[in-house]
Amino acid sequence: MPESLRTTGTELCITVNGTDVWLQGQGDEVVLMLHGWPDTRALWDGTVAALQDRCTCARLTLPGFESGPSATPLDDMCQLLRQIADRISPDKPVTLMLHDWGCLFGYEFAMRHPERVARVVAVDIGDHNSGALLRSWSTKQKLSVAGYQLWLALAWQLGQHVSVSLGNRMTRAMARWLRCPTDPARITCRMNYPYAMQWWGLAGGLKGAARVRLSMPLLYVYGTRKPFMFHSPKWLDALATREGCAVQGLPCGHWVMLSRPEAFHACVRDWLDGKTLSTSAT
């Protein structure tokens, strides 16, 4: 069997430009799943189990989070996602399922290559770089966001240039403070590079990221029990009234698919099946 194609149990693994992409399930619709901090493709284990009877689920661990380059520029990430989409679904556009930093990278890919994306399911990150979001935060919320993100960016920097052990300890401490459900043993400071891109311009930075204006249908699911939101009320209200789109708030924190798996997966299945959701925008 070629190195770029192998199987493990019920999963098929292909390698695209040095990145392993794992496929599982059946169906003509291909759902490409992108995680964020501080996760890996394992974030989607439950979601794959819930959807694999109706679609083919494809997932990867973002470059640099476990192995590979220390940081991936935005242009390179979009190019990689295009290569993956072309490989796993050459004849039809994919459905994106996104969380956290996966939303930022996935949104950018969808806006640059709309012909390759049929629709999007996004979790907990909306108009992340809009003026409306910044204006919606109180001073305390702005300081909270800057505080945790700069801490993680610093942990990445220290891990790269001073001590990996120190960087890892700082990262795991912040994950505990944020009540992250990910196994601490799997969390490392490598996973923090998007924060260094955001604040310090690492690997070209993220100032080139477009405002979030998707041309395809979008289901946006978010946790309502958080000290701050990553969407503006203006963006949420507009999305809730847009044809083909839906908004669903669930009583939990940032990791919606882990905190409220049954409700999340039922919502996603219904929307993918074309059912009208009882939209909840809080």
Task: Give, region by region, the residue ranges found by the protein language model.
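Flexible "cap/lid" subdomain of the alpha/beta-hydrolase fold that forms the substrate-access gate
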Residues: 43, 58, 63-95, 104-248, ...
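An N-terminal hydrophobic leader/cap segment in hydrolases
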Residues: 1-12
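C-terminal alpha-helix
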Residues: 84-88, 267-278
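The conserved beta1-alpha1 loop
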Residues: 32-36, 99, 222-223
